[in-house]
Amino acid sequence: MEATKVHVVIGVDPENRMYLLDLWRGQTSSDVWIEAWCDLVCKWKPAFWAEEYGQIISGVGPYLKRRAIERRAYTCREQFPSRGDKAVRAQSMRGRMATLGLYVRQGAPWFADLRAELLSFPAGKHDDQVDALGLVGQLLNKIRAGENPKPPTVVRSDGYVPSSEDTRNWSWKTL
């Protein structure tokens, strides 16, 4: 029986609020979850990806790397050892969620299962989604708040621009 694999994608807005943008979960063979991982990386383009060291490197690491290159699924993958108990490993994310929250789209098809697992942890039957969020917690020191989008540049139809916006570095000789 294959182990359940979970991928989560987190985003952070300019106010440092964390959003669970996407989640994939499946009890599948390695090739299936690797394709799901590539799909998420291509869709969301995350800056970092946390994964368990032993499980990935010793098992499917070369295949994952090859598929990522073939699919152009580029991100900075960071491996963390899976030591200690799961409740301890989830503490950094638990603290982050307690202070600044974790925003989740309630209409998401995976929301009910995620909520049930979070509320029953550590006594619940399943903890794979908690593990995935705990891995995100390992990256908290690298996560920065997002930036507000810059307003679009307005181009005047007559071709004139204010001198403060002119980027040609005029000198007194060209006036």
Q: Where would I find each of the regions flagged by the language model?
A:
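Short glycine-centered helix-capping/turn motifs at secondary-structure transition points
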Residues: 100-101
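Conserved beta-strand -> loop -> alpha-helix junction used to position metal-binding or nucleic-acid-contacting
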Residues: 70-96
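RNase H-like, metal-dependent nuclease domains and their acidic two-metal-ion catalytic environment used
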Residues: 1-79, 104-175
